[in-house]
Regions:
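PRPP-associated nucleotide enzymes
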Residues: 1-190
Length: 190
């Protein structure tokens, strides 16, 4: 199943001011939380790249994105997104290296954080390669992490900023009720 945010502008058409307004609201929260810090925002391909770019513009922050593309001659840091249709993700190592000398906080930008596992894999990879050079945070429109995942992030001092907290515990059960052979379904009941 795929939960679609009707205001995001990725899966179904939306008036640009609706999507951009939502992105501005998230940028405001990030800006207040990390006021005065120089930030590197990393938008996750493919769905969160526009969100990350919009936040970076509003915050005056550095920006890069993960990718699934392969450019010859570029060194990447590879990690996996186990639940995705295309599991391999990567970031350009040279861009992280360049940020390491002048940026302290990396903010990972997502449309929705469900388990936090993909971001956690990238955090572990960056800590392995860069030690304590960076602190990490996550900014998302939706946060569906369960209590155990949130506690893991808190224990590791990874900040969380989001617009809406969601409960995904019943999604598989609810989605199973709607077999529509790939056709658009109306929103599920609460």
């Amino acid at each position: 199943y795929l939960v679609v945010n009707k205001h995001q502008g990725k899966h179904i058409p939306v008036a640009p001011d609706k999507a951009l307004g939502m992105f501005r609201a998230l940028a405001d929260l990030v800006g207040r939380r990390y006021q005065g810090e120089q930030l590197l925002l990393i938008g996750f391909a493919e769905t969160a790249t526009a969100i990350g770019e919009a936040l970076a513009i509003q915050l005056g922050a550095d920006y890069m994105q993960t990718t699934r593309e392969n450019i010859p001659g570029v060194e990447y840091l590879h990690f996996s997104e186990s639940h995705s249709h295309a599991t391999e993700q990567k970031v350009v190592k040279d861009d992280i290296d360049a940020a390491a000398g002048r940026i302290r906080r990396i903010v990972f930008v997502e449309d929705e954080v469900t388990t936090g596992n993909t971001i956690w894999k990238l955090i572990c990879l960056l800590r392995q390669g860069y030690g304590e050079k960076f602190c990490f945070s996550v900014a998302s429109l939706l946060n569906g992490m369960d209590a155990a995942a949130q506690e893991k992030y808190q224990a590791a001092q990874v900040g969380m900023v989001y617009l809406v907290k969601t409960d995904h515990s019943r999604y598989p059960e609810l989605a199973a009720q709607y077999q529509n052979n790939g056709k658009y379904c109306e929103p599920l009941p609460p």
